[in-house]
């Protein structure tokens, strides 16, 4: 009975989202809104949601909406072009959202081929023009940078892009080397992503989060290794990254906490000097995201200590849930639940079952509390929350939406090239 209620509740919210997007695309037919084309806030996330929720009752309706939204995206791309190849704001995000359709229709295959060619152009241009002195998170991170693009590219089983994957892996690996006495990933104050972060880190910092920092780079290097794309330098970089977390874990007994950013004098003295002003237990920053680094790193390097610690990090974070005051994926409860689900799938652990069950039981309340002000986006809006809830009601996955979150269901399967 509860399952039927959950499905009805999800369906009601999806219909509301469709109505909002139908109206929005109608009004903006002759205008350009960059956000509409992004995985973060736009139609790619809606396409993923609809594809996952298709069943015998609504398959034709949802597929028609998917086709309409893809046509809308193509019309905008034809007129305005692409601004970036990134996962959350550009070509990689659009490509990921339609990748599951590549065998269904020749037009989708052609669109993917076009997007992939642009991604290759974008990556090569970015790396060729890169200046280490001006490095900023969008150069390398998951959201806007090459780590996110690589996560998408590793889904493509096409030798044509093997060199491109290795090019990104080498680029990311080199960023763990020293530059002027600091790791190359150290970001100057003026190169932070926002004015508030520049003010927070007047001396610059090494970002320790998953979304914009060191953990995200480590996760994608570990996954690339499992997929058969690695070398001595990338494995050394992965080890170096994890050792940084080992060295700078806050000295609070069995808390498994890290600061969001490390400052130059801390890195040089190899110890935490400044007190953390704020700690969040989320996908984007904090223990949950870092637990993925330890999990993937441990599996890739065959290190049981790292794998065991990954589970402890996540367990501690789930008990605290610091700074978690919403249901979004990025820095809310949905993101935590998806990480818990991954640990269950990869490690066959039951330690997080109670959190997942509680989330499922409260699904109706969760969707009711998720107001219109939260938006419909994938990363911070209700469509992402619905995707997380949907896995409790629909057992088959049709798309690759978890890949965008560095949640690699196939990590144990590998997929190395023969």
From Swiss-Prot:
It holds the Pfam family LANC_like. Gene3D superfamilies: 1.50.10.20. One of its GO terms (biological process) is peptide modification. It comes from the Bacteria. InterPro entries: LanC, LANC-like, Nisin_biosynthesis_NisC. Could be implicated in the processing or the export process of the nisin lantibiotic. To B.subtilis SpaC and S.epidermidis EpiC. This is Nisin biosynthesis protein NisC. It comes from Lactococcus lactis subsp. lactis (Streptococcus lactis). The lineage of its organism: Bacteria, Bacillati, Bacillota, Bacilli, Lactobacillales.
């Amino acid at each position: 009975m509860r399952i039927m209620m959950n499905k009805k509740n999800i369906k009601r919210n999806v219909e509301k989202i469709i109505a909002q997007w139908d109206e929005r695309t109608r009004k903006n037919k002759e205008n350009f809104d960059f956000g509409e084309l992004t995985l973060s806030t736009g139609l790619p996330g809606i396409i993923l949601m609809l594809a996952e929720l298709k069943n015998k009752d609504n398959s034709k309706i949802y597929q028609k909406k998917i086709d309409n939204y893809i046509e809308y995206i193509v019309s905008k791309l034809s007129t305005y072009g692409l601004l970036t190849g990134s996962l959350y704001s550009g070509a990689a995000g659009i490509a990921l959202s339609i990748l599951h359709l590549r065998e269904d229709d020749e037009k989708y295959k052609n669109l993917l081929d076009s997007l992939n060619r642009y991604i290759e152009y974008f990556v090569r241009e970015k790396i060729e023009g890169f200046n280490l002195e001006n490095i900023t998170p969008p150069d390398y991170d998951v959201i806007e940078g090459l780590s996110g693009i690589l996560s998408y590219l590793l889904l493509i089983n096409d030798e044509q892009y093997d060199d491109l994957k290795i090019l990104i892996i080498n680029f990311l690996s080199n960023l763990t080397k020293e530059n002027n006495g600091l790791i190359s990933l150290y970001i100057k104050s003026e190169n932070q992503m926002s004015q508030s972060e520049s003010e927070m880190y007047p001396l610059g910092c090494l970002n320790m989060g998953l979304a914009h920092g060191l953990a995200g780079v480590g996760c994608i290097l570990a996954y690339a290794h499992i997929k058969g794309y690695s070398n001595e330098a990338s494995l050394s970089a992965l080890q170096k990254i994890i050792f940084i977390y080992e060295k700078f874990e806050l000295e609070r007994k069995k808390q498994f906490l890290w600061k969001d950013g490390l400052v130059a004098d801390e890195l040089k003295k190899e110890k935490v000097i400044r007190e953390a002003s704020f700690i969040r237990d989320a996908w984007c920053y904090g223990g949950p995201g870092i637990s993925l680094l330890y999990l993937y790193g441990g599996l890739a390097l065959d290190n049981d200590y790292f794998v065991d610690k990954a589970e402890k990090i996540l367990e501690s974070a789930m008990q605290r849930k610091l700074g978690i005051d919403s249901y979004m994926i990025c820095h809310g409860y949905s993101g935590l639940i998806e990480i818990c689900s991954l640990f269950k799938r990869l490690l066959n652990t039951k330690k997080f079952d109670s959190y997942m069950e509680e989330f499922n039981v409260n699904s109706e309340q969760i969707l009711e509390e998720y107001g219109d002000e939260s938006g419909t986006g994938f990363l911070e809006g209700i469509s992402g929350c619905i995707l997380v809830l949907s896995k409790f009601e629909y057992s088959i996955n049709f798309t690759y939406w978890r890949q965008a979150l560095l949640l690699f269901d196939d990590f144990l399967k590998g997929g190395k090239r023969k």
